[in-house]
């Protein structure tokens, strides 16, 4: 569960290392974001020479959360960290590589480019 002021690790090669959620998209009173949800975030830590700079406001999709999520078959999935992938306005990733596993919920939300770049889909 990601909410305003949550910090997430960036799981791609855009140059950002950490982002801070400033808004959960999907309704005026929406409070939490889970795997596959889009957030607006600001870059808090970045490497020099990357595509994004510290202070940039970006859109990102959540790919891993520490809070467990119940699947329709009754199983639960949770990860060791909160992570997101920075996306363009057309929902394609800005980076060319994805690091670490991503949740299967991204396939249901039609983030196929992220699914194809990810090394593992859980």
Curated annotation (Swiss-Prot):
<dbReference type="GO" id="GO:0006412">
    <property type="term" value="P:translation"/>
</dbReference>
<dbReference type="InterPro" id="IPR036853">
    <property type="entry name" value="Ribosomal_uL14_sf"/>
</dbReference>
<keyword id="KW-0687">Ribonucleoprotein</keyword>
<comment type="function">
    <text>Binds to 23S rRNA. Forms part of two intersubunit bridges in the 70S ribosome.</text>
</comment>
<dbReference type="InterPro" id="IPR000218">
    <property type="entry name" value="Ribosomal_uL14"/>
</dbReference>
<comment type="subunit">
    <text>Part of the 50S ribosomal subunit. Forms a cluster with proteins L3 and L19. In the 70S ribosome, L14 and L19 interact and together make contacts with the 16S rRNA in bridges B5 and B8.</text>
</comment>
<dbReference type="Pfam" id="PF00238">
    <property type="entry name" value="Ribosomal_L14"/>
</dbReference>
<protein>
    <recommendedName>
        <fullName>Large ribosomal subunit protein uL14</fullName>
    </recommendedName>
</protein>
<dbReference type="GO" id="GO:0003735">
    <property type="term" value="F:structural constituent of ribosome"/>
</dbReference>
<comment type="similarity">
    <text>Belongs to the universal ribosomal protein uL14 family.</text>
</comment>
<dbReference type="InterPro" id="IPR005745">
    <property type="entry name" value="Ribosomal_uL14_bac-type"/>
</dbReference>
<dbReference type="InterPro" id="IPR019972">
    <property type="entry name" value="Ribosomal_uL14_CS"/>
</dbReference>
<dbReference type="GO" id="GO:0070180">
    <property type="term" value="F:large ribosomal subunit rRNA binding"/>
</dbReference>
<keyword id="KW-0699">rRNA-binding</keyword>
<keyword id="KW-0694">RNA-binding</keyword>
<keyword id="KW-0689">Ribosomal protein</keyword>
<dbReference type="GO" id="GO:0022625">
    <property type="term" value="C:cytosolic large ribosomal subunit"/>
</dbReference>
């Amino acid at each position: 569960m990601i909410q305003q002021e949550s910090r997430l690790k960036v799981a791609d090669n855009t140059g950002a290392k950490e982002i801070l959620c400033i808004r959960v998209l999907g309704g005026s009173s929406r409070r939490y974001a889970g795997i596959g949800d889009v957030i607006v975030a600001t870059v808090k830590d970045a490497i020099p020479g990357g595509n994004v700079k510290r202070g940039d406001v970006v859109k990102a999709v959540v790919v891993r959360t520490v809070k467990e999520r119940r699947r329709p078959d009754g199983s639960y999935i949770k990860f060791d960290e909160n992570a997101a992938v920075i996306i363009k306005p057309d929902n394609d990733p800005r980076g060319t590589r994805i690091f670490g596993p991503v949740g299967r919920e991204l396939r249901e939300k039609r983030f196929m480019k992220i699914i194809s770049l990810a090394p593992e889909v859980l």
